[in-house]
């Protein structure tokens, strides 16, 4: 709220509405009493701790107006004031470049968009149409005034708000447009004073794990002024501001409740919306733009929101511009001015009290009971406006615009604007005053040209406070990381437990150090993903000028530091000492320092990648290739001397390589080891005639040089991360355009005007009259209800934090065929919960009691598929078209006995009924690139209608987010359906009087789910009004909205208290007795009819379609979904190609030497490292379809859970097959495996088997992913499980440690690891039965005894140990190679060529296990097991 005394400004200006007139006498008395009693100004601001004080926001008698007036008085007493910003704008034209439609990209046609993308690089506007959005706008909003912006979606409301608030990314404003922000230019306002001119979008993004109190405390501390009265600490003052705002918006009770989101349980949707509003209010901007911020609020809370803005404007002189799609009359009357937009044209700007008369004088009629805002927006709908017969009013947007420009009102507005501009010239005295007052409110040392209140260091401290709060709210991930690290350290170190002090441990020690550096380096890779979740929040708060994005980045690094230290210690302390590395204290702490620096260096790298890329898909491939490069060029997999020249530079820039080198020196420098194996191992061998079988090394001491280099890399990486986080923003939407399947794009002319973000809304807002009304009334093809659904004493109990809580309390009612029943209630009354319980969607969650009967019968297992439930969230598969979504529902939900042709015909009838012909082949898409809000609502209804629900239709919030005319159209549809015999129960938030009148009956709930009324509404709501007035409600005045009046009567708004116990009044009323008599009659009549019923046995089946048909239809849709997700498919294929190609080139043409064989083995080892990335790519796609299935399709009994799981698994097979071809070709041939096969005379068989193994590997990864994600909620949890299991399989596959080297205890893990069999099969297929030729460095050199040749001297040893001598006839400098053929090498890693096909078969068993486990785990963890219904 503006109290945010971040502003210290001049007194209210003469043109500001006088707050004295607005204050009630009671509030003035409060102010005088408590201002005089306060010891100081500061204490009077805080209002003491008296619970009865109207200035105490924690008290029951808190009065917001008194508090605000008191604050204003205290501020003036100190010689200060409040910053104020008005705005005048002249000749504003806004346009953009885009396309009204686009074709849907899929795997096959995505390349067709490449020329356009190239053209865009060189000519950004090429191939795009100029779209005029706003045309010639002029207006003036003075400080302390409120302006409401009205217009249908797509008219330009959002663009107007963004333009005047300076958020014009993707938009173009004409150069000669003039803006005057009370003496400040637009450029200065947008750059230097961004936080004083904010735009609040309608989306709610918050950190879900923070409480409401913490979220709002952060906002208050980020923007509150720095200079306060003596005796008040800044934190106490910010807490006071927070409490005041929470009390104003009625969310004081949620202070300790998590905000939550779609995955984290928290406050309700309406409360979350109020948290967003409260946060923006605490931003304390003197100029505020609110874009449809009342969406999701009931009318009482929407009015309360506007009253709060009115209070800010009156007391503190703040300027508010608000767009509202459904504005209650009471809210409209709180505004000073109104702007009406018609397809991008300004057709009125002026006083709210004169707007109605302006259009009436033009020749339009305002129907009785229609509110002024509804009348004004109806002017923009030809089908809704009512011209008088004796007039010729304007018809087109251009005509309306021209009439406005020629009007006396427009001329008066221009004169007022010119006068304002003369009073407040750009860079005049007002601008200087504003800058001085802003400087006074900023922290010491902050520049006035900075939009931020706090200094950079203060921003970092505040973000650290929030980061620590986030950690405390959810510490378990960090705890599990430490536990997991300790477990992994125990397992991995036990592989090399207590290594000896001899040369046999050399390889083991190098592997141990490699594993340590690898584990620590990549422990931060998940930080790439966490950045995307918080990016929308950081960008929003940066727009509010809370902090620099880089300050949040810096703070997150510091907050994560303790966790990084503890996780590093938890792993390395166990790992270091169990493996018996150098136990000298200095060496241990040096090791700990190096691995910690590597953790920081790689954290900076991954964070930089995440900040640099706009989407997760963009980050995945480069992160994977980077991981691969760092891993290969560490110096272990490929020794430095064996690195190819073209890629040697990677080793120089690799921090992991410097760390590994430092650890190797730290481990071996200055130590002596006993030689374990001499060559030849003869009893009479001397030092001259034998040698130790270990490769030598070059002495050196690179301890601190490498540490210095790593520290420099840490600093550089984090610096790049901070820069990227500051300047790289998330991917922006292209604007709301329709996307069609290629070949189905209709010829839609460009509008030439409209809102770029909502470009196609105008096309979609087709009135329902376009469909043939006779189709519904005649009942042609449409099936209505024939049964009565009734319920009695329904209760719903839930356990929250260990305490029982009743959500619904003895609710009664019925729905009869042909009736439209409204379900209303105060915010949080349990409206959606009641729908869920009645629709049997709360199975397994809480306890439902009471009777729910259909024609006197208890609901059977077919009840859910016989009812339609149009949910508030418009959940649809993004890649499906409208027609496909409807066809899918018809095929699986209509009875199997109905012919396919009849189902398709009915789909077309529903498309006509819902007037969706223009976009029937449009893709659902996402908001911004696909259907708009209204089109999604219609599709949601359509999906339920094509199912032909024989019982009833539940509709949850069908008008949420829609403008009044579109809401009318939706209610028109529901009314037509009810007249055709359909039974409908519909929840609704903000009905106008005319909208409310269209319902037949009302079920009204109070807080706690207690019924307040159930019965007829009556003509002009007479029955309802009579009931409430008869029981003590104040009279409903003529012309007022009965729905709003009813909500106020029961105390729905935070500032309104109910004078009576309405639930108790209802239970004592004769109407309540009549309801129970009718319920008893319905039950008795239905029981009498039971014997006459002869239902079809198939009607009791759980699903309408047989299992085989479900599998075919669902699999087909799942495949289409993947086919139409080219970003996923090409990311998967690109990852496989890039990985194989990179490995193939790094190990290009590997020789058949000892090191060459090791390189080939490690090439196979590196290929397996992409499992984590493939898992991360696949999981989000699965979760998208699972969310749709579990939220909408499973409760509707559309198809079986087993069909869902199997369809997801089958769909991945074609793409795994395709990727395996590229992966095999780019791996098998560059490395040279084909040469090995040809040398062994088995080229065809080995090549084919190698491809089968690669294909099998990708299939295994796919099924492994499904197993890990099937039963958990999020991709993070599934990824952690998959990562843990994969690491075990990865390290125990026999590459890093052969089975003979493993402790006996861990042999079972080697045998249990599926990768053991895959690696064995690939190794043996890759280079079995081939001769080995050692390089010069690989020969062990020694001299034979005098008189002997090398061959003679080594004959006995070779017969026992194998190998060969380089030159058997030599008499000196014998060169001995320990391996003669590749089979010896394979035997050392327990790989046998004869078991290749056996291993191939065993891996299929693992794949089968993955599938079975995925099905079992899904059923156990996610399928409701029973009905908690009594």
Curated annotation (Swiss-Prot):
The chain crosses the membrane at residues 476-496, 511-531, 557-577, 586-606, 620-640, 707-727, 1133-1153, 1213-1233, 1249-1269, 1278-1298, 1305-1325, 1400-1420. It is a multi-pass membrane protein. It is found in: Cell membrane. InterPro entries: AAA+_ATPase, ABC2_TM, ABC_trans_N, ABC_transporter-like_ATP-bd, ABC_transporter-like_CS, ABCG_dom, ABCG_PDR_1, ABCG_PDR_2. It holds the Pfam family ABC2_membrane_7. ATP binds at residues 825-832. Residues 112-368, 789-1032 form the ABC transporter domain. Disruption phenotype: Abolishes the production of eupenifeldin. It comes from the Eukaryota. Residues 1-26 are annotated as: Disordered. GO terms for molecular function: ABC-type transporter activity; ATP binding; ATP hydrolysis activity. Glycans are attached at residues 292, 684, 1019. Eupenifeldin is a bistropolone-humulene meroterpenoid first discovered as an antitumor and anti-leukemia agent. This metabolite also shows anthelmintic activity against the parasitic worm Hemonchus contortus, anti-malarial activity as well as antifungal activity. Keywords: ATP-binding, Cell membrane, Glycoprotein, Membrane, Nucleotide-binding, Repeat, Transmembrane, Transmembrane helix, Transport. PROSITE patterns: ABC_TRANSPORTER_1, ABC_TRANSPORTER_2. One of its GO terms (cellular component) is plasma membrane. ABC transporter; part of the gene cluster that mediates the biosynthesis of eupenifeldin, a bistropolone meroterpenoid that acts as an antitumor agent. Belongs to the ABC transporter superfamily. ABCG family. PDR (TC 3.A.1.205) subfamily. This is ABC transporter eupT. It comes from Phoma sp.
């Amino acid at each position: 709220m503006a109290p945010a005394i971040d502003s210290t400004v001049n007194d209210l200006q003469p043109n500001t509405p006088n707050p004295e007139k607005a204050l009630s006498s009671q509030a003035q008395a409060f102010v005088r009493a408590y201002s005089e009693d306060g010891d100081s100004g500061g204490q009077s601001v805080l209002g003491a701790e008296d619970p009865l004080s109207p200035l105490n926001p924690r008290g029951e008698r808190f009065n917001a107006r008194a508090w605000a007036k008191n604050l204003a008085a205290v501020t003036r007493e100190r010689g200060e004031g409040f910053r104020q910003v008005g705005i005048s704008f002249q000749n504003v034209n806004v346009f953009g470049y885009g396309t009204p439609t686009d074709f849907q990209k899929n795997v096959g046609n995505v390349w067709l968009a490449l020329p356009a993308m190239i053209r865009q690089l060189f000519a950004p506007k090429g191939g795009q149409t100029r779209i005029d959005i706003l045309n010639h706008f002029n207006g003036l909003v003075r400080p302390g005034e409120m302006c409401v912006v009205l217009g249908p979606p797509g008219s330009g409301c959002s663009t107007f708000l963004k333009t005047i608030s300076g958020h014009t990314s993707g938009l173009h404003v004409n150069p000669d447009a003039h803006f005057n922000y009370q003496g400040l230019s637009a450029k200065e306002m947008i750059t230097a004073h961004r936080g004083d001119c904010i735009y609040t979008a309608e989306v709610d993004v918050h950190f879900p794990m923070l409480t409401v109190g913490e979220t709002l405390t952060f906002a208050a501390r980020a923007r509150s002024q720095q200079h306060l009265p003596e005796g008040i600490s800044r934190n106490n003052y910010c807490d006071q501001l927070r409490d005041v705002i929470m009390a104003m918006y009625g969310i004081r009770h949620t202070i300790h409740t998590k905000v939550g989101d779609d995955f984290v349980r928290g406050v309700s949707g309406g409360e979350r919306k109020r948290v967003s509003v409260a946060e923006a209010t605490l931003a304390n901007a003197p100029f505020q733009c609110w874009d449809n911020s009342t969406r999701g609020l009931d009318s009482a809370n929407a009015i309360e929101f506007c009253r709060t803005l009115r209070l800010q404007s009156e007391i503190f002189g703040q300027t508010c511009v608000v767009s509202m799609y459904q504005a209650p009359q009471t809210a409209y009357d709180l505004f000073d001015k109104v702007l009406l937009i018609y397809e991008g044209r300004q057709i009125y700007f002026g006083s709210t009290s004169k707007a109605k008369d302006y259009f009436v004088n033009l020749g339009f009629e305002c129907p009785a009971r229609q509110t002024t805002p509804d009348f004004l927006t109806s002017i923009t709908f030809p089908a809704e406006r009512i011209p008088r017969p004796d007039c010729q009013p304007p018809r087109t947007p251009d005509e309306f615009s021209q009439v406005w420009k020629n009007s006396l009102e427009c001329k008066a507005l221009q004169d007022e604007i010119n006068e304002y501009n003369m009073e407040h010239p750009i860079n005049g005295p007002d601008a200087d005053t504003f800058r001085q007052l802003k400087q006074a409110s900023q922290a010491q040392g902050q520049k006035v040209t900075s939009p931020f209140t706090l200094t950079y260091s203060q921003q970092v401290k505040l973000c650290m406070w929030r980061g620590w709060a986030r950690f405390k709210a959810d510490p378990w991930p960090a705890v599990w990381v430490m536990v997991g690290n300790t477990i992994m350290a125990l397992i991995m170190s036990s592989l090399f437990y207590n290594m000896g002090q001899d040369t046999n441990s050399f390889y083991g020690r190098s592997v141990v150090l490699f594993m340590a550096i690898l584990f620590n380096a990549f422990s931060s890779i998940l930080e790439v993903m966490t950045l995307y979740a918080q990016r929308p929040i950081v960008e929003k708060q940066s727009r509010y000028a809370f902090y620099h994005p880089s300050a949040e980045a810096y703070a997150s690094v510091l907050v994560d530091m303790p966790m990084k230290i503890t996780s590093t210690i938890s792993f390395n302390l166990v790992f270091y000492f169990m493996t018996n590395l150098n136990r000298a204290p200095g060496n241990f702490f040096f090791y700990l320092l190096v691995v910690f620096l590597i953790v920081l260096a790689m954290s900076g790298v991954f964070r930089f990648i995440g900040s640099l890329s706009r989407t997760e898909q963009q980050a995945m491939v480069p992160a994977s290739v980077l991981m691969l490069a760092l891993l290969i060029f560490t110096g272990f997999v490929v020794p430095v001397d064996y690195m190819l020249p073209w890629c040697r530079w990677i080793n120089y820039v690799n921090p992991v390589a410097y760390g590994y080198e430092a650890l190797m020196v730290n481990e071996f420098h200055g130590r002596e080891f006993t030689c374990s194996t001499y060559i030849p191992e003869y009893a009479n061998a001397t030092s001259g005639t034998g040698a130790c079988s270990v490769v030598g090394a070059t002495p050196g001491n690179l301890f601190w040089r490498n540490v210095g280099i790593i520290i420099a890399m840490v600093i550089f990486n984090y610096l790049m991360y901070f820069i990227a986080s500051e300047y790289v923003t998330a991917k922006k939407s292209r604007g709301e355009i329709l996307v069609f399947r290629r070949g189905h794009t209709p010829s839609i002319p460009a509008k030439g005007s409209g809102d770029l973000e909502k470009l196609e809304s105008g096309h979609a807002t087709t009135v329902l009259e376009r469909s043939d009304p006779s189709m519904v009334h005649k009942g042609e093809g449409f099936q209505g209800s024939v049964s009565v659904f009734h319920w009695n004493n329904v209760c719903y109990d839930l356990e929250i934090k260990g305490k029982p809580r009743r959500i619904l309390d003895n609710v009664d009612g019925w729905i009869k065929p042909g009736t439209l029943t409204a379900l209303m209630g105060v915010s949080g009354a349990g409206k959606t919960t009641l729908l869920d319980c009645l629709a049997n969607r709360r199975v397994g969650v809480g306890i439902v009691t009471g009777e729910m009967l259909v024609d006197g019968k208890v609901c059977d297992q077919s009840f859910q598929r016989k009812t339609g439930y149009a949910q508030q969230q418009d959940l649809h598969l993004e890649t499906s078209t409208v027609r496909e979504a409807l066809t899918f529902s018809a095929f699986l939900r209509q009875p199997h006995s109905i012919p396919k042709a009849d189902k398709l015909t009915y789909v077309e009838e529903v498309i006509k009924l819902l007037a969706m012909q223009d976009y029937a082949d449009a893709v659902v898409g996402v908001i911004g690139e696909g259907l708009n809000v209204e089109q999604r609502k219609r599709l949601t209804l359509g999906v339920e209608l094509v199912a032909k629900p024989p019982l009833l239709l539940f509709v949850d919030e069908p008008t949420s987010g829609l403008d009044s005319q579109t809401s009318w159209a939706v209610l028109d549809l529901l009314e037509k359906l009810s007249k055709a015999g359909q039974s409908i129960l519909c929840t609704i938030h903000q009905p106008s009087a005319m909208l409310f009148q269209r319902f037949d009956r009302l079920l009204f709930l109070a807080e706690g789910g207690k019924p307040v009324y159930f019965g007829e509404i009556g003509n002009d709501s007479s029955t309802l009004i009579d009931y409430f007035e008869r029981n003590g409600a104040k009279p409903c005045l003529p012309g007022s909205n009965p729905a709003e009046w009813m909500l106020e009567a029961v105390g729905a708004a935070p500032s309104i208290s109910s004078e009576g116990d309405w639930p108790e009044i209802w239970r004592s009323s004769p109407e309540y007795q009549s309801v129970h008599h009718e319920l008893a009659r319905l039950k008795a009549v239905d029981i009498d009819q039971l014997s006459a019923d002869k239902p079809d046995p198939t009607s009791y089946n759980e699903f309408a379609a047989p299992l085989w048909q479900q599998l075919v239809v669902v699999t087909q849709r799942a495949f289409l979904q993947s086919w139409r997700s080219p970003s996923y498919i090409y990311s998967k294929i690109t990852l496989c190609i890039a990985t194989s190609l990179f490995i193939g080139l790094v190990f290009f043409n590997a020789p058949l030497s000892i090191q060459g064989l090791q390189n080939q083995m490690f090439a196979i080892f590196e290929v397996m490292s992409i499992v984590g990335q493939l898992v991360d790519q696949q999981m989000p796609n699965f979760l998208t379809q699972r969310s749709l299935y579990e939220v909408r399709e499973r409760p509707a009994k559309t198809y079986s859970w087993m069909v869902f799981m199997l369809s997801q698994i089958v769909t991945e097979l074609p793409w795994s097959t395709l990727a395996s071809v590229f992966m095999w070709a780019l791996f098998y041939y560059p490395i040279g495996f084909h040469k090995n096969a040809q040398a062994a005379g088995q080229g065809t068989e080995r090549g084919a088997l190698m491809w089968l193994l690669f294909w099998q590997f990708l299939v295994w990864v796919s099924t492994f992913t499904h197993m890990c994600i099937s039963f958990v909620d999020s991709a993070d949890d599934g990824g952690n499980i998959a990562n843990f299991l994969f690491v075990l399989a990865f390290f125990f596959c026999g590459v890093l440690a052969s089975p003979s080297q493993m402790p006996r205890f861990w042999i079972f893990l080697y045998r249990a690891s599926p990768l053991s069999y895959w690696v064995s099969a690939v190794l043996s297929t890759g280079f079995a039965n081939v001769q080995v030729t050692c390089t010069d460095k690989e020969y062990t050199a020694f001299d034979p005894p005098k008189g002997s040749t090398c061959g003679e001297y080594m004959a006995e040893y070779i017969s026992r140990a194998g190998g060969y001598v380089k030159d058997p006839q030599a008499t000196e400098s014998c060169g001995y190679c320990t391996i003669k053929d590749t089979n010896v090498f394979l035997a050392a890693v327990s790989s046998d060529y004869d078991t290749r096909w056996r291993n191939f078969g065993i891996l299929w068993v693992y794949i089968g296990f993955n599938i079975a486990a995925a099905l079992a785990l899904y059923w156990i963890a996610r399928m409701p097991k029973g009905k908690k219904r009594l």
